[in-house]
Regions:
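Positively charged, small/polar-rich N-terminal and surface patches that mediate targeting and assembly
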Residues: 1-74
Length: 74
């Protein structure tokens, strides 16, 4: 399950200079045991040398959503 938020303005330092441009934000929901595989897949598809891939721990996940996610991740 992913959400793609297009047309975001990004400002960052790269190679010693401030860069800016349009990017998209991908939010992918998965389990901790799938993070490594997801990271590898995103890196293989991404055009950047060093994409910002973050795993954020959650304080709460709705039980129905967690069940659905488990059923669909296999």
């Amino acid at each position: 399950c992913v959400n793609i938020i297009p047309h975001m303005q990004s400002i960052y330092r790269w190679d010693g200079t401030i860069q800016q441009g349009k990017e998209a934000l991908l939010i992918a929901k998965t389990r901790a045991d799938k993070v490594h595989d997801l990271n590898a897949r995103v890196r293989s598809l991404h055009s950047y040398d060093m994409p910002a891939i973050l795993a954020i721990p959650l304080l709460h996940v709705d039980a129905d959503f967690a069940k659905w996610l488990d059923e669909n991740l296999g």
